Amino acid sequence: LPLDRCFEVDALALWIPHGADQPITPDELAKALTASGESLRPGDALLVGTGWDVHWDQPDFVTHPPYFTAAAIDWVLEHEVALLGSDTPRYDSPHNPQNFFPKFFQHDILLLAPVVNLAQVRRPRGKLTALPLAIKGACASPVRALWIEE
């Protein structure tokens, strides 16, 4: 993985509070973007905070998180982001599958999950660094994500 894809990437953080099994929709993404007062530029990393990270130690953390609808993923793809991160441990619903991953991965977008402490982001625009471990042949890795506010 080239470092420029995960080191000091221009990033935007959006806040969309959600509870268990609630879908994240394109309308909510658009409203959160407008509320941020920022624009989402091609190549940006997009972080979506729902507040779900506070459920880290709860039995439903992995089984009932908020999830992205297929239309929300289409919205993300239309904005040509380089990385999508969220405080949910999974992007699709195990109870209402959206089946967007084949289309999503055709766009070579990195996924970052679960991100914690997005509620502490004070400004929506920043730089994201999320360096993976150098594991040969791996398709995933833990990272320590750092947010630097502009």
Question: Can you say where each PLM-predicted feature lies in the sequence?
Answer:
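Active-/binding-site microenvironments in catalytic and ligand-binding cores
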Residues: 1-150
